[in-house]
């Protein structure tokens, strides 16, 4: 891997596929889900993640899967992404009881339409660039994996008029819906974050719910490299500097939603989620959260 290919600065109209730019983050996270799945105590097993890594041909991630890390430091990122995956899995399991519409924003290689048990009649709308959605569907079809809900791929760039594309895919704004915005916000400017939430708010009927969050609301590559000195093997980013793909200006999602009348549950970080899942966060997880500032939010529109 090289920083020139994956760590280039963003532009307002940049594009990507599954092995470049922002798209590579989806592949990397899928790799960590696959690693957590083969670990001793996976919180949210994803048996399909390994298919994406194999199909990508990415040498680094395929080597990781062939020789899975074992130490508490080396498994930190897979473990923490397992925690994040469990959070959003639980959100959809809970929200599905009150809606037949689930929307996964910037779906990437999210396999919840295929992994989770959805109530009969549920439609899962996956929003992302066409080439990303096509890669996912093609790989899973090759392995005979079928979605467990009606899956509607919504090929759209979030910087364009994606609500119109969502409407065209059959979304009904007059009915309650459940939305996930997972790991996306660091890759958007504050203005883009505001626009995203405003559009979601406009599309949500009363009773709708949203979950948003990321392992890192900020990512300082230099601090991560420095952490390697005391926690060897923790930096599974290799030489890729993903902080070059993120923006420093941020919106506070909890405040934004509350100001518009949404009922926001207490904001939690990774360490609090781990404790809630019966885990004792090891020292490396505490250090990582201090660097990355995780936050996870659930809100309901009354």
Curated annotation (Swiss-Prot):
GO terms for biological process: methylation. Exhibits S-adenosyl-L-methionine-dependent methyltransferase activity. S-adenosyl-L-methionine binds at residues 128, 157-158. The lineage of its organism: Bacteria, Bacillati, Actinomycetota, Actinomycetes, Mycobacteriales. This is Putative S-adenosyl-L-methionine-dependent methyltransferase MUL_2961. Coiled coil: none annotated. Pfam families: LCM. GO terms for molecular function: methyltransferase activity. Keywords: Methyltransferase, S-adenosyl-L-methionine, Transferase. Belongs to the UPF0677 family. The keyword Transferase applies. Its EC number is 2.1.1.-. The keyword Nucleotide-binding does not apply. Transmembrane segments: none annotated.
